[in-house]
């Protein structure tokens, strides 16, 4: 029996939607509120690949109406200094093991989110575009050669970080867990549709200007090694998210040459996990940008 094609999913006010590739969204006859809940049901993404379609709408009609695709995620793991380009620009030595942290799931937000910055606590909020992995099956004590088998999908993330809070507290979780600091989406792409798992591209733009452009081929700890390391200590469960690290080009990296580089100057930040060889798609939400706006692209 042929396996169903890996779906490309969004979440709307009318439930889960499947992108068709020709500008349409098939609204599915499924009871799940988001992709994490679908995965916790225990059948991977297959139900979304084969579900009956209630009706079809143009993707353009959902501009500004897409919801967080992983709102019910229970755990978000992150890793610091995991790109060679980031290590080079900061002058830091390569870590000998992944520098892991937890990001509160309550920090999550979705496409076209406007973030209320915690200005009474932090003046140094910074963007971090990342490729995010969505776990599909329970994972514990998993060897590297079996790690990818536990990944259901990938998506884009903006691991917003209050640099000054991290510095004064010594705690990455506190600096990364303010409400809205964990944007994911806008879409979730089934792993089977990823052409090259070892080189997933990432593009981050600020006010329309490219700031971060890299691929996971530059990771210090490639995905299988990263997942295997986490699973030595933790049971990763369906719907959990693992952020793979941010490349060079954050506001912090630019501070030496641009001392005024602060979030207050960022009208919008867009993170895109692009299909290999393709140009970034237009922003889903073409309205004038507002302070602190995050746009995650399909």
Tell what function each PLM region has.
Residues 21-22, 28-30, 113, 120, ...:
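Surface loops and adjacent helix of pleckstrin homology
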Residues 10, 15-17, 153, 175, ...:
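Glycine-centered structural positions embedded in regular secondary structure
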Residues 17, 124, 241:
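His/acidic/aromatic-lined binding-pocket segments of jelly-roll/cupin-type domains
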Residues 73-227, 233:
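Glycine-enriched loop-and-adjacent helix/strand subsegments that border the catalytic/binding cleft
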Residues 2-3, 56, 60, 116, ...:
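Catalytic-pocket segment enriched in acidic/His residues
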Residues 1-98, 263-267:
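N-terminal non-catalytic cap/leader segment that marks the start of a structured domain
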